[in-house]
Amino acid sequence: MKLIENTEFGGERPLFASHDIHLDNVTIREGESAIKECSNIVATNCRFEGNYPFWHVHGFTIDNCYFAVGGRSALWYSDHLTMKNTVIDAPKMFREMNDIDIENVEINDADEIFWRCNRINIKNLKLHEGTYPFMFSKDIRIDGLESDSKYVFQYVKNAEIHNARITTKDAFWEVEDVTIYDSELNGEYLGWHSRNLRLVNCHISGEQPLCYAHGLVLENCMFDASCDRAFEYTTLNADIKGHITNIKNPTSGIIVADSIGSITLDENIKAPADCEIKTRN
């Protein structure tokens, strides 16, 4: 592997079609597509300021690097990436990618990141600002996530998430086969139109959670007092720890809680309208 260190590049495609190179303490200045159509690339202690640096790259590692605002749309149409100990201030990262491993990364403009990506493994990720992270992605495994980005995990399939703290409305809309463990989920309209969403040991806050869901499972979950009109038109099996403020027109299944503030079953309930709702003795 060729070592390139303590230098900088700018302009158009300065390292186009490079293979088997290690960039250390390199700055990519203003320009486009610095490391395009490359393979077997290692970047350590580097700074990226130009647009689209890693497009169509196959097999690469990014460690202890920084992506400035100008380094937007930096990682598209690539595969087999390992990224560690990196800070990103640029939006629209990770698009149409496969086989991504992330550890100890902070993204400060998480706008439209991780779109249409497959096989993502994440440990300790912080997301700030931006909209729609993880849209249309699948096969995701996460342990450790802090996010205040809007509308996360919409249209996601086959995900397992541990130890997350997520604050946004409209999270997990239209997801399929997603399980969330030991997490804090804050925001209105959580998990609407989901299929096979499972929450284990989670704390939920925000109004109208988990409506229009099919095959919802809750295990030992807690609800904040703000959670009114929960489970409208949802089929579910729910084990709720503590109190829930209000349950409205669930379609079918079973709900067990320690206490329930109120239950709304009115003329608008949908068939089969046979959900069993009870409190523990």
Feature locations, PLM:
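Long, distal/terminal scaffolding or interaction modules
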Residues: M1-N281
